Regions:
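Active-site proximal loop and beta-alpha junction motif in alpha/beta enzyme cores
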Residues: 1-29, 35-177
Length: 177
């Protein structure tokens, strides 16, 4: 049930050129479709190590037999985080304002295959209650080059590795609202 599809467009041994598509657009990378492709390869040919050449960069993928089931994983392209400038339009589209944001996690743009904004909301009530216009958000995403999701999070406890994070990944490019 995920809206992205991976296509293997070329292959040289364990090195494969892979392209990803949502229902409405090509996207540079999709983790779910990467795992599904690795599992399909392992089921057809046996477990192994692969390199997927993607628009986002090379992604190392492994598929192994785990007690009769195929388990797959990958190492993402090098992640990058940068400051988010001029958030007023995005916040307005989400029905949020600066007072709704969690000061422990400044607004940022993150990359691990696709650029996307990360918005941390201070309270669970605002996190559960915000809404947005999918078409207007899609237009902003197209303008800003965000081909993946807009990630909105709420951290109820300490901001730390292993902590609980509530997340909504808004994906109008994939027709998920």
């Amino acid at each position: 049930g995920y809206p992205e599809t991976a296509y293997v467009t070329a292959r040289d041994g364990a090195r494969l050129r892979v392209r990803y598509f949502s229902p409405e657009a090509e996207v540079p990378f999709c983790g779910h479709a990467t795992i599904a492709t690795a599992v399909a390869l392992a089921e057809a040919e046996g477990p192994g190590e692969f390199v997927f050449e993607t628009t986002a960069g090379d992604v190392r993928v492994s598929a192994r037999d785990d007690g009769g089931r195929i388990a797959a994983g990958f190492t993402s392209v090098e992640p990058v985080v940068r400051d988010f400038h001029d958030p007023a339009r995005l916040l307005g589209l989400l029905g949020l304002n600066a007072d709704d944001l969690d000061p422990r996690m400044p607004l940022a743009e993150a990359f691990a295959g696709n650029w996307h904004p990360v918005v941390a909301v201070r309270t669970l009530e605002r996190f559960d209650g915000f809404g947005y216009d999918a078409d207007a958000l899609r237009a902003l995403m197209d303008e800003r080059g965000w081909t993946g999701t807009v990630t909105v999070v709420h951290v109820p406890g300490e901001v730390a590795d292993g902590g609980v994070v509530e997340a909504r990944n808004l994906f109008p490019v994939g027709d998920i609202t």
